[in-house]
Amino acid sequence: FIKKEKRKEDPYKNIAIEDPKQLALFWQCSEELSPRFPFKAELHQFMLLTAMRKTECLKMEKAHINFEKGTLFIPKGISKTKYRDEELPITPELEVLLRNILDLGNRPDFPFYKMKDFRWLFATRNWGAQKYFNKDFRLSHKARLGGDEKYIPVLRALMREKSGDPDLLYAPKILRKTYITKSQQIFAGRSEITQQMSRHRNIDVLNSHYNKPGIETRREYASEVSKVFSFIQRRTA
């Protein structure tokens, strides 16, 4: 008989950022690290404001943004459930972030980002002059951001330093949980409202099959939650 070792419990399994000051700290540190980790810092910010999964965010395209309609399109092909095409409302805070992301194309090291046929919202850092006119590369999955593994410990360390808490826990997986937790608190546990932004398919049969609010109703829901992120500001040149 071989006794199996107990699996270590994931320290981030039941964690969400509930303290408004810690939320603001996360945003401040992300802004501070953006020049060093462009697109990676914004990826984490985007995850917080949309409650989207990282794998979904990395596949988002600039064309999925419709400022005129105020919607963010999520094709079923990139959704985890792959159930149907979905839309999220663009709140004022999310619009600020999206415009900040698009403004990364103004940086001298990312001239390719504004090219009409460069489709990815989060671009690769692995870019060279030889790839500038390589259309196949620009249109391929290789041109989008691959991951954030090196960024996570740097952001965590900066948050710990600024908070004075050496045990502060941070991982990107808590961002979706944070949005959902905040939504549940604001809407007094009404899961059918939270579900419209978290895009969970199965909370219960009633909510899945009969609760179908339109985009404007969901915009009201999302705007209420988004007021929590009042610290977000447009970047200056």
Model-predicted segments: where are they?
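Conserved tyrosine-mediated DNA breakage-rejoining catalytic core shared by Y-recombinases
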Residues: 3-4, 59-100
